[in-house]
Amino acid sequence: NIPAIITNCSNNYGPRQHPEKLIPKLIYNILNNKTLPIYGKGLNSREWIYVDDHCEALIIVSKKGKIGNFYNIGSNINLNNLEITKHLLKFAKSKTKIGKNVKIKFVKDRPGHDLRYALNSNKIIKNLKWKPKVGILKGLEITFDWYLKNPNYYLKLKKKDITRRLGNKSK
């Protein structure tokens, strides 16, 4: 037997996230005056957790969690893709002149794309006394500010070919 604890988490976001993910992709497009592609009607909902909160939860689980148990790590904050996009556009308008004329383009949804991802995190909250500290608006603002201050991050990754995942064709 291997002593183990299993965790599941909701959608992470924050600085240095892989640029193909929704939030960094939207920020990159906003800061480069590119169209914002939104799947379907933008109503796909996700439970979002700021990366630092997820890391803190993992540390707490490693110290206080019980062997053989599983813990869901989430924020109970659900926003759809269109809501995330609108918040990021508000940050752009208040913090920079870039991205003020960016347009949203609704694109065909991926086949089998789930409408909602969410977790029940009551066990970790109740048993381990953990809860996330960073609210969604604060986390999005921190993330937006980081990408604003690090405009070459995506380009550096692209040079290392880290933006190409296995099975994807190079662009």
Identify what each model region corresponds to.
Residues 5-6, 24-171:
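C-terminal substrate-binding subdomain of Rossmann-fold SDR/epimerase-dehydratase oxidoreductases
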Residues 15-17, 21:
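Short beta-loop-alpha junction of Rossmann-like oxidoreductase domains
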Residues 1-15, 37:
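Conserved beta-loop-beta element that borders a ligand/cofactor-binding pocket
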